[in-house]
Amino acid sequence: MAVLQPPKTNYGKMKLFINGKWIESSTESYIPVYDPGKGEVIAEMPSATKEEIDEAVEAAYEAFKSWSRLPVPERMQYIFRMKYLLEENKEALARVNTQNHGKTIRESRGDLRRTIENVEAAISALYSLAKGEYQQEIAKDIDEVLTREPVGVFSIITPYNFPIMIPFWFIPYALALGDTLVVKVSPVTPLPMMATMEILANELPPGVLNLIYADDAMSEHLVTHPLVEGTAFVGTSRVGLRVYELSASHGKRFLGGGSASNYAVVMPDADLDRTVSVLRDSKFGNTGQRCL
């Protein structure tokens, strides 16, 4: 079992994770990262340069050539290892999550539980998602065969409110199915995913999973990069629409989730005590940054 250490109080200048290595950015643009509970700057996040974005995408592109050809059971072993490492380090990651985001430690532990469940779901669904179909005599003297193959490099752009959980809505599925990734997280809460990558860094082949930080202009460069096949996005509807427009205009795939605040219909026979408790947590839980 991992020895639990308290989170750092000063992370210094953060690094990019590209092609299996932590790289100090050559950018002159650094963004302060806060511990909102104390109002203190605890890290400086680099906004990657165009050349660094290109390097990350090209690393993922080169890694795809071998990663996509691995048999499904071999890729599955990497995802099993990912699950084990997340479980082994979930308390340490939850503490970094709370430190950088501000949510309660109970909520962060819940985030890690859901993160691990996403990995488990990817493992359980992999063979169904990867297998093709065969239809005999679909028409006279015609049989139909459908195969599913890895697509290529995808970018993942995620918001600040669930810094680890939301990236893992996509990471285990994409990797298990043979694609490679460049992940761009929110500049508000970049530390939890950085801490996660520190745990996973030596467990995947170089270039398969890359982590960068970028401003708006460089994020658009990532989305429209010629070697990127598509983008998975979660964030505000305004930004999501922009990513959708960029993806569509460049002939790329897009999977998006935008802003949401669900309505509640309270029926006359509802248990009001329970209803009010649920609505309160939905509205004010996660420091008021929940979209469910």
Task: Report each predicted region and the residues it spans.
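Periplasmic-binding protein-like
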Residues: P172, G230-V234
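Residue-level signal for inorganic ion chemistry
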Residues: G39, R75, N97, G178, ...
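N-terminal Rossmann-like NAD(P)+-binding subdomain of aldehyde/semialdehyde dehydrogenases
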Residues: M1-I142
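Short gly/pro/ser/thr-enriched loop/turn and capping motifs at secondary-structure boundaries
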Residues: V188-L191, L211, M218, R238-L241, ...
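Hydrophobic residues in well-ordered beta-strands that form the structural core
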Residues: V183-K184, Y213, G256
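ALDH superfamily catalytic-core signature
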Residues: R238-L292
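Conserved small-residue-rich beta-alpha loop and adjacent elements
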Residues: Y134-P205
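A structured beta-alpha segment of the ubiquitous adenosine-cofactor-binding alpha/beta core
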Residues: D143-E144, L211-E229
